[in-house]
Amino acid sequence: MLRGKHFPVIVLGLVLVLMVGVVNCTPSVSDGECDAVKAELDKANAELSELREVKAELDKAKAELAEVKAASLEELLRERRSVRDYADAPLTQDEVLKLLWAGQGTTRAWGGRTAPSAGALYPLELYLVAGNVENLAPGVYKYKPEENKLTHVKDGDVRAGLAAAAWGQACVREGAIDIVIAAVYERTTRKYGPRGETYVHIEVGHAAQNICLQATALGLGLVTVGAFNDAGVRIIVGMSQDEIPLYVIPVGRKT
């Protein structure tokens, strides 16, 4: 760690560098004195390098803080609201991944995730219906928690079709994206039997609330939608037969 007493040494080093560029010992200066000055200069240079590293870390931290609005959990809970009207403006890929990570991101080396899961069985699957995302082609993508990445499912902007499956709710069509949460019930029911269905429903609530709070932190608007035709959503998104849609969450910039 740097201490205040080191700064005179740093200043001395800078003065020496500016005046002579390098230390050249003269016959009037003993070898011991010359070596001592060189040692101080080397020490000053090392601490200058450390200062630069500290500054770089601070700059990086400031940039990261600027991406997400600093707020306590209490503030986020107070500010969270359902938003159904969105500006015609794109989201960034970074924002999208932050939202998906909040819902099902991996937080432990063994695979633990952001939302609690009965038996750590993780029956949920997250799909991204992208319509207006910077540098991301419109289409459907599936979230891979282990890599925090998207895999391509199908091309094309399907927001209008998804809105039709959600009984014509305009917010589903007008959001920059829709996050669709599906469940593979069998992952949980094979251990817990019929009770496992309840555990899945509890878990999707955990994941959705995480996404809501992340959106609030990012200054984005969203609403959780549960009214839709299951078969229609499954076909439009391109889900497998064992995946049942539970939530459609449109997200966009606030107007």
Task: Please give the residue ranges for each predicted region.
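Short, surface-exposed helix-loop/turn micro-motifs enriched in polar/charged residues
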Residues: 118, 222-225, 241
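Secretory targeting signatures
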Residues: 1-30
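N-terminal amphipathic, basic helical "cap/leader" segment at the start of enzyme domains
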Residues: 41, 47-48, 53, 58-174
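Solvent-exposed coil/turn segments that connect beta secondary-structure elements
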Residues: 104, 131-133, 145-146, 182-186, ...
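A glycine-rich helix N-cap at a beta->alpha junction
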Residues: 238-255
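Conserved hydrophobic/aromatic beta-strand scaffold that supports enzyme active sites
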Residues: 142, 178-180, 248
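Short, low-complexity, disordered segments immediately C-terminal to signal peptides
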Residues: 29-41
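Small-aliphatic-rich amphipathic alpha-helix that forms the alpha element of a beta-alpha
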Residues: 80, 99, 126, 177-187, ...
